[in-house]
Amino acid sequence: FKSGSGTGSNFSRIRGEGESLSGGGRSSGLMSFLRIGDRAAGAIKSGGTTRRAAKMVTVDVDHPDIEAYVDWKVVEEQKVAALVAGSKLAQLHMGEVMAACHDEAVSGDDRFDPRANKRLKKAIIAARGAMIPENYVQRVIQFARQGYTEIEFKTYDTDWDSEAYLTVAGQNSNNSVRVSNEFLQAVLDKGDWELVKRRDNGVAKRINASDLWEKIAYAAWACADPGLQYDTTINEWHTCPEGGRINASNPCSEYMFLDDTACNLASLNLMQFRHEDGSFDIPAFEHACRFWTLTLEISVLMAQFPSKEIAQLSYEYRTLGLGFANIGGLLMAQGHSYDSDEGRAICGSISAIMTGVAYATSAEIASEVGPFPQYKKNAKHMLRVMKNHRLAAHGKAKGYKGLNILPVPLDAAPCPDQKLIDAAKVAWDKAV
C-alpha cells in the first residue's frame, strides 16, 4: 500500500464463525478479519497520494461464511442510505419542532406544551411518524425553552468519498467469489451445495446452490460486488501449475498467478496508434509490445518488492504485465459501439496481437539469456496453454486440450480491419 501498489488475497483459509479453535474457544469468523483489513486499507493512502489503497478480497464459494460475505456490501450500502435519508428527515422534523416552539400565535410557556400548542403537537406526531427518536424531539423543545431558535443536525450525502461511506465497512476493496465448475453445475441442477469447515473439512452447512447464486447476482446488481472468479477455468489456463494453483488476483483481476508473486504493469495508450484516417498502426503497436516486454523484463531485477518471498518468486517466474488503455476511446474514434460485434472483434484482435508478440519476445529473450528458472518443470503446461491461445486466435471451435469449458474464439467476420485478424494469427504462430 505504502509504495502505491495493490494487493490481492484469498481469505478462504480463515475459519468460519463458530468453528472450534485449536487452543479452545470458537472462531469469530471470516468477516471480523475482513473488517479489520478494510479499516487498515482505508487508513493508508496509496503511495502517499489521496487515493486509498487498492485491495482485492477473494473467498471460495464453499466457505462457511460465504453468505455473510456476499451480503456484506449490500448491508453496508443500506446503512449509507439510512444515514443519508435519516439525517435529512431528522433535520427536517427537528426544524419543524423548533419552529413550532417559537410560534408567535401561542404565548408564554404554552409554546413548549403540545397540549396547548397545536402546531407543536402536529410537528411531534409527524416526527414520531418519521421514526425520529423521542429524546431528540424533547432535546429540541428544551433548546427552544433556553431561547435557541435553531438547532444544528449534520446531514450526509451519497458521494463516494463522503463521511457516510467512510462510516461504514467494506468500501476499501474489490470483493470476489471464487466459483468452481462443480458449483456452477449444482446451480444448473438446482442441487445442494456444501459449505466446508476450514479445520477438518467437515460439512458446516448445506444450502441450495441456486439460492446462493441468486444472492450473488442480487448483491452484484445492488452494489456492484462481489465479482466472480472462475476458479476451474483460471487454473486450466495456468501456465505454471507445478508451482501451485492460482487462488486470487490483483485488485483489477488482470494479474492471476501464484501466491506471493508480484507483477509490474505497463499500459499502451491505443489512441497513440490510430492513424489520421482511423486505421490502426499494427507495426508500431507490435514494436511497442516488443519494446515494453523487454522493459518489463529488465524491471524484474530493478523493482522493489514488499517481502523476500515475493522478490524470490518474482525472480524465479519473471512475471510481467503488459496491457493497453483507451480501447473505448479508440472504438469511439473509429465509429464503433463499445458493446458491438465489431468492437469485440477489434478488441480481441488487439489483445491477441499484444499477448502473442509479448510471448514471442519473451521466447526470444530466453534464447539469449535462458528461460526463467521455473520454466523447465512447467514447459509442457505452458506449451499446452500457448497452443490453446493460438487456436483461439485462429478462430477455431475445437482442438483445445485440458479445458472443460472452451473459450470464445476470435471472430474474424465482424472485424472491420482484417489486417488485425491476420496480425493476431501471425503473432500466435510466432509465439508457439
Regions found by a protein language model. Give the residues of each.
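Function-dense linear segments that define catalytic or interfacial modules
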Residues: 1-22, 30-33, 44-47, 216-334
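Catalytic or ion-translocation cores adjacent to nucleophile or general acid/base/metal-coordination motifs
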Residues: 2, 20-42, 49, 70-103, ...
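Inter-helical turn/loop segments and adjacent helix faces that build the functional surface
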Residues: 21, 44-56, 77-81, 127, ...
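Terminal amphipathic helices with adjacent charged low-complexity linkers/tails
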Residues: 71, 84-88, 94-98, 153-159, ...
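Structured secondary-structure scaffolds
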Residues: 188, 195, 202-203, 207-233
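Internal maturation/activation junctions in enzymes
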Residues: 200-202, 287-311, 315, 319, ...
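Proteins synthesized as precursors that undergo proteolytic processing into mature forms
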Residues: 60-61
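Extended, regular secondary-structure scaffolds
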Residues: 54, 71-72, 77-206
